């Protein structure tokens, strides 16, 4: 198979839209079949973002939580909802990408936390302590810039801290995580209403959660 054919076969089709598989691209580059610049140039010419970092990050997180369907389902939902809220709030593409990435990795501290303290004993604070170092390695692997890595790791290290929210990205991640947890935890409607009053600030998030849960 030619180098170009190998590169073409490295596509992932998600919802009818094709994205380039970054992990496969790196393997091709390491094999010196195609240089990384040539890979990017080829896919740029045919109108595909060759370096869709969040697709690669999604795959890394599925591998990270392999065998733990509950955790996989959770981060997928939080990331998707965070991205949707960002778009609804009119966030630019850069912030939307960052918020989605934060949603993907926000709970990566659970695995090392449970390894240290036992299953069911990984509190939100432990997640905040253990998560950033794991997230950093994954974000570096898929090609995020140091500046964005620092911000995403900050969000991972504070996503259970609600009195220090300092930006739209932080607020959107918290609201998305709360909405998913409301459902997954089977929280009573009156408790949801109190949490929404206390935590939710964005118009899109407030409207969605009230509509979704009939508040």
Stretches with model-predicted labels:
Residues 7-10, 25, 29:
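Ala/Thr-enriched low-complexity intrinsically disordered regions
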């Amino acid at each position: 198979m030619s180098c170009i054919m190998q590169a073409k076969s490295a596509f992932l089709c998600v919802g009818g839209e094709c994205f380039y598989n970054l992990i496969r691209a790196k393997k091709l580059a390491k094999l010196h079949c195609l240089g990384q610049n040539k890979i990017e140039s080829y896919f740029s010419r045919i109108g595909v973002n060759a370096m869709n970092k969040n697709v690669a990050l999604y795959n890394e997180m599925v591998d990270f939580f392999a065998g733990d369907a509950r955790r996989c389902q959770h981060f997928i939902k939080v990331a998707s909802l965070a991205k949707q809220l960002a778009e609804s709030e009119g966030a630019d593409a850069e912030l939307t990408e960052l918020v989605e990435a934060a949603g993907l990795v926000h709970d990566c501290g659970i695995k090392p936390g449970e390894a240290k303290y036992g299953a069911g004993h990984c509190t939100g604070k432990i997640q905040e302590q253990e998560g950033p170092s794991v997230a950093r390695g994954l974000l570096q692997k898929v090609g995020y810039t140091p500046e964005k890595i620092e911000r995403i790791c900050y969000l991972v290290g504070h996503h259970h801290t609600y009195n220090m929210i300092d930006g739209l990205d932080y607020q959107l991640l918290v609201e998305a995580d709360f909405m998913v947890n409301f459902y997954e935890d089977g929280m009573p409607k009156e408790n949801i209403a109190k949490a929404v009053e206390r935590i939710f600030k964005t118009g899109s998030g407030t409207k969605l959660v009230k509509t979704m849960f009939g508040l």
